[in-house]
């Protein structure tokens, strides 16, 4: 689902409702102090649950003293973020 690669956390599982809980938990477990970049370049499918997962990682980053950024967000997820008015909450790498 998520693996460390080249200093980033590469998300490889589809960002869909069926995987949301597993991705949320895997991302939380991977958080560490400092900058953490979630890279979505290997994601080939995503739905609205992706926004919830990303916001969950941002919330979990605070107690972990991590600074989360997102790279290669799928176009559909970006569109949903704009629709929901949360684009400014998703820091880009």
Name each region found by the language model.
Residues 1-49, 56-93:
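STAS-like cytosolic regulatory interaction modules
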């Amino acid at each position: 689902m998520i693996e460390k690669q080249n200093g980033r956390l590469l998300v490889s599982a589809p960002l869909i409702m069926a995987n949301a809980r597993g991705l949320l938990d895997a991302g939380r477990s991977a958080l560490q102090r400092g900058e953490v970049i979630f890279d979505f370049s290997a994601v080939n499918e995503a739905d609205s649950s992706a926004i919830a997962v990303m916001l969950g990682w941002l919330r979990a980053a605070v107690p972990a003293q991590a600074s989360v950024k997102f790279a290669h967000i799928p176009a559909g997820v970006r569109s949903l973020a704009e629709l929901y008015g949360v684009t400014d909450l998703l820091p880009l790498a």
